[in-house]
């Protein structure tokens, strides 16, 4: 289990992980690592929250929020943000399904992708600032938001098909079963409940689950399935929806 965690941490983040800690794990077995996603999100959110706490006293709430969002993006190598941008470029191109998928593979940033990045990053900064000004525990909020967003991404993997013939997303999409999905969502719910007592965290997770489920169905209808890019988009939007639900 520990080897699986380190393999997933290395796979979906840019945090340094010694290669020997995940050696011997077959790439085809990575789908089992979905249950570690909430824990990895918890770690990323906690680091981002610590950055906010350290900087808040020095440079104020808005800049602390800016740098915490920046650190979160750096820890993932902009992986999920890139997926969000590619998804928006493809989906909002209003082309055929095959052409949308081609556009999503284009490394160039389009207008829709650029607007999506600006909106999501700016919205995160503003929502974090507002929550901090209300006296909310930002460390706990970010840890819960990142755990829940990565946990609910399982909703785009379970009983979905991969929209392409090959790609990194194919490791998870359509490869996880109902038990893995329930365990992943259950862990995310536990983290949300413990970090944000009084049912606030669980309620925000329910809102996030509904939003991500609807997103998955819309993408399925538009693209014929999911891709690694749509998973990244779901994680980014899941973080934002969770934080918005706490306002």
Swiss-Prot record:
Its cofactor is Mg(2+). The keyword Coiled coil does not apply. GO terms for biological process: cobalamin biosynthetic process. HAMAP family: CobS. Joins adenosylcobinamide-GDP and alpha-ribazole to generate adenosylcobalamin (Ado-cobalamin). Also synthesizes adenosylcobalamin 5'-phosphate from adenosylcobinamide-GDP and alpha-ribazole 5'-phosphate. Belongs to the CobS family. This is Adenosylcobinamide-GDP ribazoletransferase. The lineage of its organism: Bacteria, Pseudomonadati, Pseudomonadota, Gammaproteobacteria, Enterobacterales.
């Amino acid at each position: 289990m520990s080897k699986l965690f380190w393999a997933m941490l290395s796979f979906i983040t840019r945090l340094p992980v010694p290669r020997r800690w995940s050696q011997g794990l077959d790439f085809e077995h990575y789908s089992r690592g979905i249950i570690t996603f909430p824990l990895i999100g918890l770690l990323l959110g906690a680091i981002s929250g610590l950055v906010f706490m350290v900087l808040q006293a020095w440079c104020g709430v808005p800049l602390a929020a800016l740098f915490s969002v920046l650190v979160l993006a750096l820890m993932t190598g902009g992986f999920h943000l890139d997926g969000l941008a590619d998804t928006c470029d493809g989906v909002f191109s209003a082309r055929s399904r095959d052409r949308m998928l081609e556009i999503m593979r284009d490394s160039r940033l389009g207008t829709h992708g650029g607007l999506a990045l600006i909106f999501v990053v700016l919205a995160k900064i503003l929502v974090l600032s507002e929550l901090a000004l209300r006296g909310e525990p930002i460390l706990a909020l970010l840890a819960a938001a990142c755990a829940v967003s990565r946990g609910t991404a399982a909703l785009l993997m379970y009983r979905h098909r991969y929209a392409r013939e090959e790609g990194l997303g194919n490791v998870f999409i359509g490869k996880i079963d109902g038990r893995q999905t329930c365990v992943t969502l259950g862990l995310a719910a536990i983290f949300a409940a413990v970090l944000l007592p009084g049912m606030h965290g669980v309620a925000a997770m329910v809102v996030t689950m509904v939003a991500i489920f609807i997103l998955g169905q819309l993408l399925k209808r538009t693209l014929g399935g999911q891709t690694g890019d749509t998973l990244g988009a779901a994680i980014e939007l899941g973080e934002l929806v969770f934080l918005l639900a706490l306002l």
